[in-house]
Protein backbone atom coordinates (compact mmCIF):
# COMPACT_ATOMS: atom_id res chain seq x y z
CA UNK A 1 0.00 0.00 0.00
CA UNK A 2 1.35 3.41 -1.00
CA UNK A 3 0.38 6.17 1.42
CA UNK A 4 0.37 9.55 -0.36
CA UNK A 5 1.69 12.53 1.54
CA UNK A 6 -0.88 14.85 3.04
CA UNK A 7 0.15 18.24 1.68
CA UNK A 8 -1.63 20.18 4.41
CA UNK A 9 0.23 18.37 7.20
CA UNK A 10 3.59 18.73 5.46
CA UNK A 11 2.98 22.44 4.94
CA UNK A 12 2.17 22.97 8.62
CA UNK A 13 4.96 20.83 10.04
CA UNK A 14 7.68 22.23 7.80
CA UNK A 15 6.72 25.89 8.03
CA UNK A 16 5.27 26.51 11.49
CA UNK A 17 8.73 26.74 13.11
CA UNK A 18 9.63 29.60 10.74
CA UNK A 19 6.46 31.67 11.26
CA UNK A 20 6.14 34.65 13.57
CA UNK A 21 2.40 34.86 12.91
CA UNK A 22 0.31 31.69 12.71
CA UNK A 23 -3.18 31.74 11.21
CA UNK A 24 -2.90 28.14 10.05
CA UNK A 25 -3.48 25.94 13.11
CA UNK A 26 -7.17 25.22 13.62
CA UNK A 27 -7.47 24.56 17.34
CA UNK A 28 -8.11 26.84 20.29
CA UNK A 29 -5.31 27.61 22.76
CA UNK A 30 -4.76 24.55 24.93
CA UNK A 31 -5.98 24.10 28.49
CA UNK A 32 -3.14 24.28 31.03
CA UNK A 33 -2.65 21.80 33.87
CA UNK A 34 -3.52 24.58 36.29
CA UNK A 35 -6.79 25.26 34.44
CA UNK A 36 -7.53 21.53 34.26
CA UNK A 37 -7.15 21.02 37.99
CA UNK A 38 -9.21 24.12 38.79
CA UNK A 39 -12.03 22.91 36.54
CA UNK A 40 -12.06 19.27 37.64
CA UNK A 41 -10.48 19.20 41.12
CA UNK A 42 -8.97 15.93 39.91
CA UNK A 43 -5.43 14.63 39.88
CA UNK A 44 -4.22 11.07 39.59
CA UNK A 45 -3.83 9.31 42.93
CA UNK A 46 -0.31 8.23 43.81
CA UNK A 47 -1.16 4.56 43.37
CA UNK A 48 -2.69 5.00 39.90
CA UNK A 49 -1.41 2.15 37.71
CA UNK A 50 0.13 3.63 34.56
CA UNK A 51 0.31 0.15 33.06
CA UNK A 52 -3.46 -0.05 32.68
CA UNK A 53 -5.14 -0.30 29.29
CA UNK A 54 -8.78 -0.33 28.28
CA UNK A 55 -9.12 -2.04 24.91
CA UNK A 56 -12.83 -1.21 24.79
CA UNK A 57 -12.37 2.32 26.10
CA UNK A 58 -12.40 3.72 29.61
CA UNK A 59 -15.81 3.24 31.23
CA UNK A 60 -15.56 6.75 32.65
CA UNK A 61 -15.24 8.30 29.19
CA UNK A 62 -17.99 6.12 27.75
CA UNK A 63 -20.38 7.22 30.51
CA UNK A 64 -19.58 10.85 29.78
CA UNK A 65 -20.14 10.38 26.04
CA UNK A 66 -23.41 8.53 26.71
CA UNK A 67 -24.61 11.61 28.56
CA UNK A 68 -23.50 14.00 25.80
CA UNK A 69 -24.95 12.02 22.88
CA UNK A 70 -27.87 10.34 24.66
CA UNK A 71 -26.62 6.97 23.49
CA UNK A 72 -25.60 3.63 25.01
CA UNK A 73 -22.05 2.36 25.47
CA UNK A 74 -22.66 -0.05 22.57
CA UNK A 75 -22.83 3.00 20.30
CA UNK A 76 -19.30 4.14 21.21
CA UNK A 77 -15.78 3.31 20.09
CA UNK A 78 -13.09 5.41 21.74
CA UNK A 79 -10.10 6.19 19.54
CA UNK A 80 -6.75 7.93 19.43
CA UNK A 81 -8.12 11.20 18.11
CA UNK A 82 -10.59 11.86 15.31
CA UNK A 83 -8.06 10.74 12.70
CA UNK A 84 -8.20 7.15 13.96
CA UNK A 85 -11.97 7.41 14.30
CA UNK A 86 -12.33 8.37 10.64
CA UNK A 87 -9.74 5.78 9.60
CA UNK A 88 -11.73 3.00 11.29
CA UNK A 89 -14.95 4.11 9.62
CA UNK A 90 -13.31 4.23 6.20
CA UNK A 91 -11.56 0.89 6.59
CA UNK A 92 -14.72 -0.83 7.81
CA UNK A 93 -16.85 0.44 4.93
CA UNK A 94 -14.75 0.70 1.81
CA UNK A 95 -13.11 -1.84 -0.45
CA UNK A 96 -11.47 -1.62 -3.84
CA UNK A 97 -14.01 -0.53 -6.44
CA UNK A 98 -16.42 1.05 -3.96
CA UNK A 99 -17.35 4.72 -4.27
CA UNK A 100 -17.53 7.36 -1.57
CA UNK A 101 -19.01 10.82 -2.00
CA UNK A 102 -16.98 13.61 -0.40
CA UNK A 103 -17.70 17.33 -0.02
CA UNK A 104 -15.36 19.69 -1.88
CA UNK A 105 -13.63 21.84 -0.81
CA UNK A 106 -12.79 19.64 2.11
CA UNK A 107 -10.27 18.36 4.60
CA UNK A 108 -7.61 16.48 2.64
CA UNK A 109 -7.34 13.30 4.79
CA UNK A 110 -11.09 12.74 4.34
CA UNK A 111 -10.49 11.65 0.75
CA UNK A 112 -6.85 10.57 0.73
CA UNK A 113 -7.40 8.04 3.52
CA UNK A 114 -10.33 6.17 1.91
CA UNK A 115 -8.45 6.12 -1.39
CA UNK A 116 -5.84 3.98 0.39
CA UNK A 117 -8.36 1.13 0.32
CA UNK A 118 -8.91 1.40 -3.43
CA UNK A 119 -12.18 3.29 -3.12
CA UNK A 120 -13.09 5.82 -5.80
CA UNK A 121 -13.71 9.43 -4.83
CA UNK A 122 -16.83 11.19 -6.12
CA UNK A 123 -16.65 14.94 -5.55
CA UNK A 124 -19.68 16.73 -4.15
CA UNK A 125 -19.12 20.48 -4.65
CA UNK A 126 -20.03 23.02 -1.98
CA UNK A 127 -19.93 26.26 -3.93
CA UNK A 128 -18.77 29.67 -2.77
CA UNK A 129 -21.60 31.22 -4.80
CA UNK A 130 -24.17 29.41 -2.62
CA UNK A 131 -22.32 30.10 0.63
CA UNK A 132 -20.82 26.60 0.76
CA UNK A 133 -24.25 25.07 1.42
CA UNK A 134 -24.88 21.40 0.63
CA UNK A 135 -26.79 20.62 -2.58
CA UNK A 136 -29.14 17.72 -1.79
CA UNK A 137 -30.37 17.32 -5.37
CA UNK A 138 -26.81 17.07 -6.63
CA UNK A 139 -26.02 14.49 -3.95
CA UNK A 140 -28.97 12.38 -5.03
CA UNK A 141 -27.66 12.39 -8.60
CA UNK A 142 -24.18 11.32 -7.46
CA UNK A 143 -25.32 8.19 -5.61
CA UNK A 144 -24.89 4.95 -7.57
CA UNK A 145 -25.07 1.26 -6.75
CA UNK A 146 -21.34 1.45 -5.98
CA UNK A 147 -21.75 4.19 -3.35
CA UNK A 148 -20.98 3.00 0.18
CA UNK A 149 -20.35 6.20 2.13
CA UNK A 150 -21.19 9.92 2.07
CA UNK A 151 -18.62 12.07 3.89
CA UNK A 152 -18.95 15.60 5.25
CA UNK A 153 -17.76 17.80 8.09
CA UNK A 154 -19.98 19.92 10.31
CA UNK A 155 -18.99 22.64 10.85
CA UNK A 156 -17.58 22.57 7.32
CA UNK A 157 -13.80 22.47 7.17
CA UNK A 158 -12.49 24.77 5.65
CA UNK A 159 -15.31 27.36 5.54
CA UNK A 160 -16.80 27.12 9.04
CA UNK A 161 -20.31 27.00 7.58
CA UNK A 162 -22.91 25.03 9.54
CA UNK A 163 -25.04 22.41 7.79
CA UNK A 164 -28.37 22.68 9.57
CA UNK A 165 -30.27 19.71 10.92
CA UNK A 166 -32.93 19.90 8.20
CA UNK A 167 -30.24 19.35 5.55
CA UNK A 168 -28.57 16.59 7.56
CA UNK A 169 -31.96 14.86 7.88
CA UNK A 170 -32.42 15.04 4.11
CA UNK A 171 -28.96 13.55 3.57
CA UNK A 172 -29.70 10.78 6.08
CA UNK A 173 -33.01 10.00 4.33
CA UNK A 174 -31.20 9.68 0.99
CA UNK A 175 -28.63 7.41 2.60
CA UNK A 176 -31.32 5.23 4.14
CA UNK A 177 -33.19 4.97 0.83
CA UNK A 178 -30.00 3.87 -0.96
CA UNK A 179 -28.68 1.66 1.87
CA UNK A 180 -25.47 3.67 2.37
CA UNK A 181 -24.02 5.39 5.42
CA UNK A 182 -23.20 9.02 6.16
CA UNK A 183 -20.04 9.96 8.05
CA UNK A 184 -20.34 13.36 9.75
CA UNK A 185 -17.12 14.59 11.34
CA UNK A 186 -18.38 16.91 14.10
CA UNK A 187 -15.03 17.95 15.51
CA UNK A 188 -15.98 21.66 15.24
CA UNK A 189 -19.71 21.36 15.99
CA UNK A 190 -19.57 22.44 19.64
CA UNK A 191 -17.95 25.64 18.40
CA UNK A 192 -21.00 26.66 16.36
CA UNK A 193 -22.35 30.14 17.10
CA UNK A 194 -25.86 28.85 16.41
CA UNK A 195 -27.55 25.99 18.24
CA UNK A 196 -27.06 22.75 16.34
CA UNK A 197 -27.54 19.22 17.74
CA UNK A 198 -25.36 16.27 16.87
CA UNK A 199 -26.45 14.20 13.88
CA UNK A 200 -26.25 10.97 15.86
CA UNK A 201 -29.58 9.16 15.97
CA UNK A 202 -30.55 9.98 12.41
CA UNK A 203 -30.82 6.89 10.19
CA UNK A 204 -27.57 5.57 8.74
CA UNK A 205 -25.48 8.34 10.34
CA UNK A 206 -22.03 7.82 11.87
CA UNK A 207 -20.54 10.64 13.94
CA UNK A 208 -16.87 11.18 14.76
CA UNK A 209 -15.28 13.82 16.95
CA UNK A 210 -12.52 14.48 19.48
CA UNK A 211 -11.46 16.69 22.38
CA UNK A 212 -8.90 18.56 20.27
CA UNK A 213 -10.30 21.55 18.40
CA UNK A 214 -12.96 23.15 20.59
CA UNK A 215 -11.99 21.93 24.04
CA UNK A 216 -8.26 22.68 23.88
CA UNK A 217 -7.29 19.14 24.86
CA UNK A 218 -5.31 18.07 21.80
CA UNK A 219 -2.52 16.52 23.85
CA UNK A 220 -4.90 13.86 25.12
CA UNK A 221 -5.56 12.55 21.57
CA UNK A 222 -8.98 11.40 22.74
CA UNK A 223 -11.47 10.75 19.95
CA UNK A 224 -14.60 8.71 19.42
CA UNK A 225 -17.07 7.16 17.02
CA UNK A 226 -20.79 7.37 17.84
CA UNK A 227 -22.76 5.05 15.58
CA UNK A 228 -25.30 2.23 15.34
CA UNK A 229 -24.11 -0.95 17.03
CA UNK A 230 -23.51 -2.84 13.77
CA UNK A 231 -20.97 -0.14 12.88
CA UNK A 232 -19.24 0.08 16.25
CA UNK A 233 -18.72 -3.69 16.33
CA UNK A 234 -16.89 -3.53 12.99
CA UNK A 235 -14.83 -0.52 14.05
CA UNK A 236 -13.91 -2.07 17.41
CA UNK A 237 -12.70 -5.22 15.62
CA UNK A 238 -10.59 -3.14 13.25
CA UNK A 239 -9.19 -1.12 16.14
CA UNK A 240 -7.41 -4.28 17.28
CA UNK A 241 -5.36 -3.93 14.07
CA UNK A 242 -4.53 -0.24 14.57
CA UNK A 243 -3.82 1.10 18.07
CA UNK A 244 -5.46 -1.73 19.98
CA UNK A 245 -6.35 0.68 22.76
CA UNK A 246 -6.26 4.43 23.22
CA UNK A 247 -4.34 5.95 26.12
CA UNK A 248 -6.18 5.04 29.32
CA UNK A 249 -4.83 8.00 31.35
CA UNK A 250 -5.84 10.36 28.52
CA UNK A 251 -9.33 8.91 28.42
CA UNK A 252 -9.69 9.24 32.20
CA UNK A 253 -8.60 12.89 32.10
CA UNK A 254 -10.90 13.59 29.14
CA UNK A 255 -13.80 11.96 30.98
CA UNK A 256 -13.33 14.09 34.07
CA UNK A 257 -13.07 17.44 32.32
CA UNK A 258 -15.91 16.82 29.85
CA UNK A 259 -18.02 15.41 32.65
CA UNK A 260 -17.35 18.27 35.05
CA UNK A 261 -16.69 21.27 32.84
CA UNK A 262 -17.76 20.70 29.22
CA UNK A 263 -20.06 23.72 29.18
CA UNK A 264 -17.33 25.88 30.70
CA UNK A 265 -14.90 24.74 28.00
CA UNK A 266 -17.45 25.59 25.32
CA UNK A 267 -17.96 29.04 26.87
CA UNK A 268 -14.18 29.48 26.99
CA UNK A 269 -14.03 28.68 23.29
CA UNK A 270 -17.01 30.83 22.35
CA UNK A 271 -15.63 33.87 24.16
CA UNK A 272 -12.35 33.70 22.22
CA UNK A 273 -13.96 32.75 18.91
CA UNK A 274 -16.67 35.42 18.95
CA UNK A 275 -14.28 38.18 19.99
CA UNK A 276 -11.84 37.21 17.26
CA UNK A 277 -14.59 36.75 14.69
CA UNK A 278 -15.75 40.35 15.20
CA UNK A 279 -12.17 41.55 14.77
CA UNK A 280 -11.74 39.45 11.64
CA UNK A 281 -15.10 40.57 10.23
CA UNK A 282 -14.19 44.23 10.64
CA UNK A 283 -10.84 43.58 9.00
CA UNK A 284 -12.45 41.72 6.08
CA UNK A 285 -14.88 44.58 5.52
CA UNK A 286 -11.88 46.84 4.99
CA UNK A 287 -10.12 44.45 2.59
CA UNK A 288 -12.67 44.07 -0.20
CA UNK A 289 -10.06 44.84 -2.82
CA UNK A 290 -8.30 41.64 -1.77
CA UNK A 291 -10.99 39.27 -0.46
CA UNK A 292 -14.54 38.04 -0.73
CA UNK A 293 -15.73 35.67 1.96
CA UNK A 294 -18.57 33.63 3.37
CA UNK A 295 -18.85 34.40 7.06
CA UNK A 296 -18.37 31.27 9.19
CA UNK A 297 -21.17 30.11 11.50
CA UNK A 298 -18.70 29.33 14.25
CA UNK A 299 -15.50 27.46 14.85
CA UNK A 300 -12.21 29.23 14.23
CA UNK A 301 -11.60 28.79 10.50
CA UNK A 302 -12.82 30.60 7.40
CA UNK A 303 -12.11 30.26 3.69
CA UNK A 304 -11.87 33.63 1.92
CA UNK A 305 -11.53 33.95 -1.85
CA UNK A 306 -8.73 36.27 -2.90
CA UNK A 307 -8.71 38.55 -5.95
CA UNK A 308 -5.02 38.41 -6.92
CA UNK A 309 -3.74 36.46 -9.91
CA UNK A 310 -1.49 33.97 -8.12
CA UNK A 311 -1.73 30.33 -7.07
CA UNK A 312 -2.68 29.73 -3.45
CA UNK A 313 0.58 27.90 -2.73
CA UNK A 314 2.64 30.74 -4.21
CA UNK A 315 0.62 33.33 -2.29
CA UNK A 316 1.05 31.51 1.01
CA UNK A 317 4.76 30.97 0.38
CA UNK A 318 5.17 34.67 -0.41
CA UNK A 319 3.45 35.64 2.83
CA UNK A 320 5.65 33.25 4.77
CA UNK A 321 8.86 34.45 3.10
CA UNK A 322 8.15 38.17 3.38
CA UNK A 323 5.94 38.52 6.47
CA UNK A 324 6.69 35.34 8.44
CA UNK A 325 2.94 34.70 8.27
CA UNK A 326 1.59 31.15 7.99
CA UNK A 327 -1.80 30.54 6.35
CA UNK A 328 -3.04 27.51 4.41
CA UNK A 329 -3.31 27.26 0.61
CA UNK A 330 -6.79 26.59 -0.73
CA UNK A 331 -5.40 24.00 -3.13
CA UNK A 332 -4.76 21.74 -0.12
CA UNK A 333 -8.54 21.74 0.36
CA UNK A 334 -9.04 21.12 -3.38
CA UNK A 335 -10.14 24.70 -4.10
CA UNK A 336 -7.73 27.02 -5.88
CA UNK A 337 -8.06 30.78 -5.44
CA UNK A 338 -8.76 30.60 -1.70
CA UNK A 339 -6.82 30.47 1.56
CA UNK A 340 -7.89 29.05 4.90
CA UNK A 341 -7.48 31.45 7.81
CA UNK A 342 -7.68 30.30 11.42
CA UNK A 343 -8.41 32.77 14.19
CA UNK A 344 -8.06 30.81 17.44
CA UNK A 345 -5.02 32.70 18.74
CA UNK A 346 -5.28 35.50 21.28
CA UNK A 347 -6.72 38.82 20.13
CA UNK A 348 -3.45 40.77 20.02
CA UNK A 349 -1.74 38.00 18.04
CA UNK A 350 -4.64 37.95 15.59
CA UNK A 351 -4.47 41.70 15.04
CA UNK A 352 -0.72 41.56 14.45
CA UNK A 353 -1.14 38.68 12.01
CA UNK A 354 -3.87 40.49 10.07
CA UNK A 355 -1.68 43.60 9.91
CA UNK A 356 1.11 41.46 8.46
CA UNK A 357 -1.31 39.91 5.97
CA UNK A 358 -2.42 43.33 4.75
CA UNK A 359 1.18 44.54 4.37
CA UNK A 360 2.06 41.40 2.42
CA UNK A 361 -0.91 41.74 0.08
CA UNK A 362 -0.24 45.41 -0.62
CA UNK A 363 3.41 44.73 -1.33
CA UNK A 364 2.47 41.90 -3.66
CA UNK A 365 -0.11 44.08 -5.38
CA UNK A 366 2.60 46.64 -6.09
CA UNK A 367 4.69 43.97 -7.82
CA UNK A 368 1.95 42.68 -10.11
How should these model regions be labeled?
Residues 1-81, 88, 260, 368:
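N-terminal small-domain helix-loop-helix segment of the aminotransferase-like
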Residues 201-234, 247-249:
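Active-site PLP attachment segment
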Residues 117, 177-178, 203, 323, ...:
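Helix C-cap/helix->beta junction micro-motif
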Residues 255, 271-281, 292-306:
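Conserved glycine-rich beta-strand-loop-beta hairpin in the small C-terminal domain of fold type I
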Residues 318-327, 333-368:
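PLP-dependent enzyme catalytic core of the Aspartate aminotransferase-like
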Residues 128-193:
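Active-site phosphate-binding strand-loop segment of PLP-dependent enzymes
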Residues 235-242, 258-281:
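Structural signature of PLP-dependent enzymes
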Residues 92-152, 173:
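PLP-dependent aminotransferase-like
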